[in-house]
Curated annotation (Swiss-Prot):
Gene: rpmI
Family matches, as SUPFAM superfamilies: L35p-like
Family note: Belongs to the bacterial ribosomal protein bL35 family.
Location of region: Disordered: 1-38
Matching NCBIfam families: rpmI_bact
Protein name as it appears in the record: Large ribosomal subunit protein bL35
Highest taxon of the lineage: Bacteria
Length: 68
């Protein structure tokens, strides 16, 4: 059986922490920001931790990636 390949798009978008949590950048700050307040755009900065169900799906896509 061949080696399992990890999903390249998922590798670029998500990160698994040492404790096993999955983090991702917050959505909604790429474009159409002119009408959003500074408070909203600041809140959308940084990373967020995925829920347990979403994290499980991401980990399945990263299964072939070493160290994940």
């Amino acid at each position: 059986m061949p080696k399992m390949k990890s999903h390249s798009g998922t590798k670029k978008r998500f990160k698994v922490t040492g404790s096993g949590k999955v983090t991702a950048r917050k959505a909604g700050k790429r474009h159409l920001n002119e009408h959003k307040s500074s408070r909203v755009t600041r809140r959308l900065t940084g990373e967020t931790v995925l829920s347990k169900g979403e994290a499980a799906k991401v980990k399945k896509l990263l299964a072939g990636h070493p160290g994940r």
